[in-house]
């Protein structure tokens, strides 16, 4: 089975449409400029989850503010450029939007990845004040997620706390990665969740970085 080699720009454009959500994602795992062919929004949206620098373009619009904030943190600290647009059935609740964005983002990561010459394994710790989280990732083609955040509140902003681990689980399943994310301590749920996403960003960034070879990091000789 052919394996793709690490290249300067690893990119994906994903469109996902169901009866519940319409999603468009443009991703570059290595930063740089990204755009979408045509926005799904009739009127262009900008919010606090938009950040443009010399090395990254990040614009997250899911309609769920705290979800935007978490994906923004994931992209920023992972070194990605990322545009996420979603129109979802938020008149029902936040479930379909959160789950489907996780699936679409996982699809984008899987499509963008190169599998030769990557480290494959990555780990990261991230503190946010009193909160400390750990994430460990394996680009394994064995989709599995263990997420223990210990959140106590019903919601953070307009995002149900039960949907935060579900987003991460949906992402891992679609990206075909093994992922363990744990919040080790902390009493502020906002801090606990955000430190977890930042730790995951650090872990993924390490796992997809070059190992200095052109080899597939597996005894099987293949990953995906």
Curated annotation (Swiss-Prot):
Give the enzyme's EC designation. Answer: 4.2.1.19
The top EC class, named as a word, is: lyase
Question: What CDD domains does UniProt report for this protein, alphabetically?
Answer: IGPD (cd07914)
- PROSITE patterns from the UniProt entry: IGP_DEHYDRATASE_1, IGP_DEHYDRATASE_2
Q: Which UniProt keywords are present, listed alphabetically?
A: Amino-acid biosynthesis, Histidine biosynthesis, Lyase
Q: Which InterPro entries match?
A: IGPD_sf, ImidazoleglycerolP_deHydtase, ImidazoleglycerP_deHydtase_CS, Ribosomal_Su5_D2-typ_SF
Q: Hey, which pathway is this one from?
A: Amino-acid biosynthesis; L-histidine biosynthesis; L-histidine from 5-phospho-alpha-D-ribose 1-diphosphate: step 6/9
What chemistry does it catalyse, as a reaction equation?
D-erythro-1-(imidazol-4-yl)glycerol 3-phosphate = 3-(imidazol-4-yl)-2-oxopropyl phosphate + H2O
Among HAMAP family, the record links this protein to: HisB (MF_00076)
| Record's protein name | Imidazoleglycerol-phosphate dehydratase
The scientific name of the source species is Cyberlindnera jadinii (Torula yeast)
């Amino acid at each position: 089975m052919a394996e793709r080699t690490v290249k300067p720009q690893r990119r994906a454009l994903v469109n996902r449409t169901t009866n519940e959500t319409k999603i468009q994602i443009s991703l570059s795992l290595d930063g740089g400029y990204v755009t979408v062919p045509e926005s799904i929004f009739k009127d262009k949206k900008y919010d606090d989850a938009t950040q443009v620098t010399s090395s990254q373009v990040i614009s997250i619009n899911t309609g769920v503010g705290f979800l935007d904030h978490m994906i923004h943190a994931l992209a920023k600290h992972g070194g990605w450029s990322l545009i996420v647009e979603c129109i979802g059935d938020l008149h029902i609740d936040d479930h379909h939007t959160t789950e489907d964005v996780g699936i679409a983002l996982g699809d984008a990561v899987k499509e963008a990845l190169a599998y030769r010459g990557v480290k494959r394994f990555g780990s990261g710790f991230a503190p946010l004040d009193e909160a400390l989280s750990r994430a460990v990732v394996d680009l394994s083609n064995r989709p599995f997620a263990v997420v223990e955040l210990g959140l106590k509140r019903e919601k953070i902003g307009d995002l149900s706390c039960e949907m935060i681990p579900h987003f991460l689980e949906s992402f891992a399943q679609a990206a075909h990665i093994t992922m363990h994310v744990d919040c080790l301590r902390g009493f502020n749920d906002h801090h606990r969740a955000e430190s977890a996403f930042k730790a995951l960003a650090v872990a993924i960034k390490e796992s997809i970085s070059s190992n200095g070879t052109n080899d597939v990091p597996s005894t099987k000789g293949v990953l995906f």
